[in-house]
Swiss-Prot record:
It comes from the Archaea. HAMAP family: Ribosomal_uL6_A. The lineage of its organism: Archaea, Methanobacteriati, Methanobacteriota, Methanomada group, Methanococci. Part of the 50S ribosomal subunit. It comes from Methanococcus maripaludis (strain C7 / ATCC BAA-1331). One of its GO terms (molecular function) is structural constituent of ribosome. The keyword Acyltransferase does not apply. GO terms for biological process: cytoplasmic translation. Belongs to the universal ribosomal protein uL6 family. The keyword Magnesium does not apply. InterPro entries: Ribosomal_uL6-like, Ribosomal_uL6-like_a/b-dom_sf, Ribosomal_uL6_a/b-dom, Ribosomal_uL6_arc, Ribosomal_uL6_CS2. This protein binds to the 23S rRNA, and is important in its secondary structure. It is located near the subunit interface in the base of the L7/L12 stalk, and near the tRNA binding site of the peptidyltransferase center. Keywords: Ribonucleoprotein, Ribosomal protein, RNA-binding, rRNA-binding. This is Large ribosomal subunit protein uL6.
Length: 182
């Protein structure tokens, strides 16, 4: 099977976005939002030219081909994050005990989950905002990984253990990920 001598991926840079490549560090900035990420892998070169981010690899192996695609997705997510941002929606569900959810500082506190006396907490990652309004929790931010991890932390904090999950369906569940309804 013939092997490509060069793999080259190009990403268009929107007008209001500034992308800087310094060694292996890629910085994407738009207005007040800025994301930096270290993208280092042997044999892969990242540069900017003519309003595009270029990712190149000469004589790539299978792993390098995969990493080029991964880096393209990371940079595209960084550009989308600083321009539009990412938003996850979670829904609070309870049947037996009404729970109270509030976001303070860098933690989300969940009181009275399944009638428990102690408070459950979930960590909010850096640069992520959490808004609780009624039965809905909205997690938003520029970094897709941090927004997703914060939403997962909240969902995992209300995991039901030691009870029949067919009966006890109380919890906080992700219903929308970055615009995609689940």
């Amino acid at each position: 099977m013939p092997v490509a001598a060069l793999i080259r991926e190009e990403i268009e840079i929107p007008e209001n976005v500034n992308v800087e490549v310094n060694g292996s560090t890629v910085a994407v900035k738009s207005g007040a939002k800025e994301l930096k990420r270290d993208l280092l892998y042997p044999g892969i070169e990242i540069s900017t030219e003519d309003g595009k981010v270029v990712i190149e690899c000469t004589f790539p192996r299978k792993a390098q081909t995969a990493i080029v695609g991964t880096y393209r997705s990371h940079i595209q997510n960084m550009i989308t994050g600083v321009t539009d941002g990412f938003e996850y929606k979670l829904v609070i569900r309870y049947a037996h005990f009404p729970m109270k959810v509030s976001a303070k500082g860098n933690t989300v506190t969940i009181d009275n989950f399944l009638g428990e006396k102690y408070t459950r907490t979930a960590k909010i990652m850096d640069g992520v905002t959490v808004k609780v309004s009624g039965e809905e929790v909205i997690v938003s931010g520029a970094n897709k990984e941090f927004v997703g991890q914060t939403a997962a932390n909240i969902e995992q904090a209300t995991k039901v253990k030691g009870r029949d999950t067919r009966i006890f369906q109380d919890g906080i569940y992700i219903v929308e990920k970055a615009g995609k309804v689940l």
